[in-house]
From Swiss-Prot:
The keyword Magnesium does not apply. InterPro entries: AAA+_ATPase (IPR003593), ABC_transporter-like_ATP-bd (IPR003439), ABC_transporter-like_CS (IPR017871), MacB-like_ATP-bd (IPR017911), P-loop_NTPase (IPR027417). Keywords: ATP-binding, Nucleotide-binding, Transport. Part of the ABC transporter complex YxdLM which could be involved in peptide resistance. Responsible for energy coupling to the transport system. ATP binds at G40, P41, S42, G43, S44, G45, K46, T47. This is ABC transporter ATP-binding protein YxdL. Induction: Transcriptionally regulated by YxdJ. Induced by the antibacterial protein LL-37, probably via YxdJ. It comes from the Bacteria. One of its GO terms (biological process) is transmembrane transport. GO terms for molecular function: ATP binding; ATP hydrolysis activity; transmembrane transporter activity. Residues 5-243 form the ABC transporter domain. Pfam families: ABC_tran.
Length: 257
């Protein structure tokens, strides 16, 4: 399977009165169709890593390749087009526009690409049916629950079939039931449609839906583990690594999935 994302020797230092090296020689790759989580303590560098992959920030050295192309070498106009075509984003706070309906929010990537209205409607109803939100398309964002808003945000992220989905704490504002619904949505898109996704999360339950978890500590790769057939076993393995990282995993060890 070809690599959809390659992270090669990424370094990032934030300069100030006291310089801080956020990332140190980070390297890993994600295959096409893989669902991977990144975990680590606060300040470990995981958000910096996601920002660099998404081109919000730039590395001091090293390379990012997405579908074989380094977006950091593109000029502004081509970079904007690359982001619209190749990347899909899912945020903790949904980032839906209150002035638009749920359906209009989902279609935004297609609107920016000036797709024909008939094509947009067809794609909208296809993804809405897949995610079980067809009955929400004419509602405003304040009329639906947090979990429904996040499923709409996921629909927006995948409607244009990007190469890579980047999710930043997608369940951070959700209760346990909505978290389960959202993670099952992402898992089914990965399994059925071979969507490639990288998710930053602090939540071991959410991470247990992934095929692989990469752990970062103090800006460096600390460990990585792969899921087998049993999600409960994988969840407990995640807790074990978090314990080594100094987290509060013991508080969650009795959770059964």
């Amino acid at each position: 399977m070809a690599n959809m994302l390659e992270v090669k020797h990424i370094n990032k230092t934030y300069k100030g009165q006291v310089s801080y090296q956020a990332l140190k020689q980070i390297s890993f790759s994600i295959e096409e169709g893989e669902f991977t989580a990144v975990m680590g303590p606060s300040g470990s560098g995981k958000t910096t890593l996601l920002n660099i992959i998404s081109t919000i920030d730039r590395p001091d050295s090293g390379d990012i390749l997405i579908n074989g192309e380094n977006p950091h070498r593109l000029k502004r106009t081509k970079l904007a087009h690359f982001r619209r075509k190749q990347l899909g984003f899912v945020f903790q706070d949904f980032n839906l526009l209150d002035t638009l309906t749920i359906g209009e929010n989902i279609m935004l990537p297609l609107t920016l690409e000036k797709e024909a209205p008939s094509v947009m409607e067809e794609k909208l109803h296809g993804i809405a049916a897949k995610l079980g939100i067809e009955n929400l398309l004419n509602k405003r964002t304040f009329e639906v629950s947090g979990g429904q808003r996040q499923r709409a945000a996921i629909a927006r992220a995948v409607i244009h079939k990007p190469s890579l989905i980047l999710a930043d704490e997608p369940t951070g504002n959700l209760d346990s039931k909505a978290t389960k619904d959202v993670m099952e949505t992402l898992q089914s898109l990965n399994r059925d449609d071979h969507v490639t996704a990288l998710m930053v999360t602090h939540d071991p339950v959410s991470a247990s839906y992934c095929r692989r978890v990469i752990f970062i500590k103090d800006g460096e790769l600390f460990n990585e583990i792969y899921r087998g057939e049993n999600r409960q076993v994988f969840y407990e393995q995640i807790l074990d690594v978090l314990s080594m990282l100094g987290g509060n995993a013991n508080d969650l060890s009795s959770v059964r999935l």
